[in-house]
Amino acid sequence: MSQPPIGGAAPATAAASPAAAATEARLHPEGSSRKQQRAQSPARPRDSSLRQTIAATRSPVGAGTKLNSVRQQQLQQQQQQGNKTGSRTGPPASIRGGGGGAEKATPLAPKGAAPGAVQPVAGAEAAPAATLAALGGRRPGPPEEPPRELESVPSKLGEPPPLGEGGGGGGEGGGAGGGSGEREGGAPQPPPPRGWRGKGVRAQQRGGSGGEGASPSPSSSSAGKTPGTGSRNSGSGVAGGGSGGGGSYWKEGCLQSELIQFHLKKERAAAAAAAAQMHAKNGGGSSSRSSPVSGPPAVCETLAVASASPMAAAAEGPQQSAEGSASGGGMQAAAPPSSQPHPQQLQEQEEMQEEMEKLREENETLKNEIDELRTEMDEMRDTFFEEDACQLQEMRHELERANKNCRILQYRLRKAERKRLRYAQTGEIDGELLRSLEQDLKVAKDVSVRLHHELENVEEKRTTTEDENEKLRQQLIEVEIAKQALQNELEKMKELSLKRRGSKDLPKSEKKAQQTPTEEDNEDLKCQLQFVKEEAALMRKKMAKIDKEKDRFEHELQKYRSFYGDLDSPLPKGEAGGPPSTREAELKLRLRLVEEEANILGRKIVELEVENRGLKAELDDLRGDDFNGSANPLMREQSESLSELRQHLQLVEDETELLRRNVADLEEQNKRITAELNKYKYKSGGHDSARHHDNAKTEALQEELKAARLQINELSGKVMQLQYENRVLMSNMQRYDLASHLGIRGSPRDSDAESDAGKKESDDDSRPPHRKREGPIGGESDSEEVRNIRCLTPTRSFYPAPGPWPKSFSDRQQMKDIRSEAERLGKTIDRLIADTSTIITEARIYVANGDLFGLMDEEDDGSRIREHELLYRINAQMKAFRKELQTFIDRLEVPKSADDRGAEEPISVSQMFQPIILLILILVLFSSLSYTTIFKLVFLFTLFFVL
């Protein structure tokens, strides 16, 4: 049963609904809450004239006309008929206007209403539910199923419905099911884009462009029932303006419900869109046989209304009102006439809205947190990349440094390998390394010597402080002993005075007074015994210290014996050690300490003897007192205590005897150690030169010695020839001088003496060198041979007195010059003899110690012995030459007068002796064995020639 179109007969308020919806959208913007919305005063009329004019311009069909009462009655009858038939045929269609959204719903008349009663039409505010209940309106019979609304959704949700077409709806009491829903009016409007949720959509949902009529469903007759689902959309048509041309007023209930519906619709739109799409995909269009629904906003609104409050729908019965909305402002199903919602529904809606707001806030916070996490992740990634880049750069720098170090080490390694190969091929020794090592060794020796001196100083200070402490202790003990002795003497004087005064008739008090001194004596003896015990303990400690020192000295002596061997045994091969100066200093220091300790012990022994004598005297006195008063029982006790004291004194005497013996043993041991130290001093003095040579130097010295042997063999022959020539020249010179100037002739005795001297010299030359004595050691100055030669120089008395001297002054001056030059030459020869003798002794020591290095063979030993014999013969010839020179000087003796003491000028005789001196110097230099001795000799001879 189709319902006739009523678009032309709609009141003016229905035409004014789009403008009202737009105004309400401005009053209630998106996102505003119910608490912030302003309630308008009910006394102020709404601007209906302006809205009516706007709606009239938009509506093509009589928009400004009013429905008369007859028309309303016809509409009510038609609605009643539709309700009756709708229960049988299907859900009545809620008429929708297409295009611009001039959507109207047929108002449903409640059951039992008077036919002439005024019913709310499209655009008018819905009456409250209480008034409808008072009128006795009842709900229609069988409920309609909500899915029928969803079946009218078109296949394409975004397409607008065709102009003038109406879709079948699910509203109660609608027109005939499946009727043509075309309208007379309804200006077409373009549909909004998909997903657009602006103010226009909400305005179109409220009223559409042509006004949205609210189709009120009849409420239940009982006042306690809650309104159906259609009552939630009861305020959807409020924005339509006043009915007719009169000014309608706002009511508080309508405004509150409208605000609630506005916010609820706004919240449900998003959730309903997804459900609509799912229903559209699954199956739609079974009920929409006449025309498709105008777009996704209608489906969203329908689903939102259907699923908003299922509990309310179950409470009030199977009643539903269909609601739809066009895409361009579409049609909505009319709400029931009860516009006042129930308080429970309002509370549920508020709770749902609060939950939605909370969820939104949580979503916003989660979004913000996600954004922050993303930024943090980006920052962490950037920092990680930066750190990786920095680490990579550092690793590159470290790799470069390591490469540089490797190159440097490779260069050094190659250099060292080259040096090693060169040394292996040529056998050369790195002189620079040896010099650096020698320098380091010298520095280390200097530092060790300096530290040793400092240690000696500290040790001396320590010993001095210990001595002072011991002296102070001894003085303290002496003072204590003197104090005790004075006290004893005072007590003895008191006893004597009491004995002189006393008699047998003395009172008991005096007897007690006599007995007290003996007790005091006993106490004094006990104190003295305590002191003696302390002294004995001190002596024991010192004896323990001395025993430790003795053990240490014995251990060191054993070390020296194992290191150097006994005096009678030959030198060990592995001889080594520090310089003898440091060893001597250490031994001297230890010897000094032992001597000081021995002196201290001796003093203590003397003091103990004095104390023992004093104690013995006191004991004798006490014994006499014991014999005098033996009858008394107190004296018996005192005698027992005295016997104990005697035993202690006997023990102390035994300890003192023991200490005396120990001190005597220590003194003997110290003497023995000093004797051994002196022996080691003499022994170690001859081996200092050999310790400073290492294997490398010995090899070099052996090569130098081989070269020196050849030169010595060559020079020895030359020296012998030159000596012979010198003798001949000297004899000729002497004869010539004596014949020309002095006229002296040698006597046969002189010739015999000379021949005897020559024989002795030849005998000395033929003898082997004396190898018992090894030259000057320690404090000795020269060798015995040099001293004997100097002592055996002929005196002036052996030669006859010269004859008369020539009287000429020039001859006498020449003789003086010759004598002075001869004396100078004699001095130089003496020095050369002394130096050569020391060199020979050093060479002998080196030969004797050659086995230390294990480098001497039998052939080398024999060649060295021959070489030393040759040097010995040269030295003997020099001594013989010195003798001849002395005889010549004695023969040339001229008495010196005061007038002749002037400056001496050298003559040509010195030029004759200079080649001999140079040859001797060369011989000595090439026969030396160490660079230090060569340096010393060169320095001496240069100093001699300079002077």
UniProtKB/Swiss-Prot annotation:
State if Calcium is listed as a keyword.
no
According to its record, how does it sit in the membrane? Answer: Single-pass membrane protein
Where along the chain is composition biased (Low complexity)? 9-24, 72-81, 109-137, 214-236, 287-297, 304-325
Q: Which residues form a coiled coil?
A: 342-726, 811-835
Q: Does the keyword Coiled coil apply?
A: yes
Domain of life assignment? Eukaryota
Keywords noted in UniProt: Coiled coil, Membrane, Phosphoprotein, Signal, Transmembrane, Transmembrane helix
Give the matching InterPro entries: MTCL1-3, SOGA_CC
- What compartments host this protein? Membrane
Q: Which residues carry this modification: Phosphoserine?
A: S569, S781
Secretion signal, residue range per the UniProt entry = 1-21
Q: What is this protein called?
A: Microtubule cross-linking factor 3
Where primarily located? membrane
